UniProtKB/Swiss-Prot annotation:
Name this polypeptide is given: Large ribosomal subunit protein uL14
Name of the gene encoding the protein in the UniProt record: rplN
GO molecular function: large ribosomal subunit rRNA binding; structural constituent of ribosome
Subunit architecture: Part of the 50S ribosomal subunit. Forms a cluster with proteins L3 and L19. In the 70S ribosome, L14 and L19 interact and together make contacts with the 16S rRNA in bridges B5 and B8.
CDD domains linked: Ribosomal_uL14
Function: Binds to 23S rRNA. Forms part of two intersubunit bridges in the 70S ribosome.
GO biological process per UniProt: translation
Pfam families: Ribosomal_L14
Length: 122
């Protein structure tokens, strides 16, 4: 579960390396975000010459969490790190590549472009 002030790795080539969660979108007073949820975040580390710079406020969708997610069949999926992909307002990724596996729950959130770019969907 991701909450305010959580730091996440960025799993795309938008230029950001690490982001800090500012707010979880989707309802007033919402505290936690899971896989497939959209957050507002600030870029804390960035690579030179990238599309986003340090200090930029961006929207991102969570693609991997350490706490994991429960599936409808009763199984759980967990990852080794917390990671997100920076997106535009129309739910398309800012970068052109996705690094690492993403969870199948992104299909339900209509993030089909991220799912198609990902090397592996678990």
């Amino acid at each position: 579960m991701i909450q305010s002030e959580s730091r996440l790795k960025v799993a795309d080539n938008s230029g950001a390396r690490e982001i800090l969660t500012i707010k979880v979108l989707g309802g007033s007073g919402r505290k936690f975000a899971n896989i497939g949820d959209v957050i507002v975040a600030s870029v804390k580390q960035a690579t030179p010459g990238g599309a986003v710079k340090k200090g930029d406020v961006v929207k991102a969708v969570i693609v991997r969490t350490k706490s994991g997610a429960r599936r409808a069949d009763g199984s759980y999926i967990k990852f080794d790190e917390n990671a997100a992909v920076i997106i535009r307002d129309d739910k398309t990724p800012r970068g052109t590549r996705i690094f690492g596996p993403v969870a199948r729950e992104l299909r339900e959130g209509n993030f089909m472009k991220i799912v198609s770019l990902a090397p592996e969907v678990l």
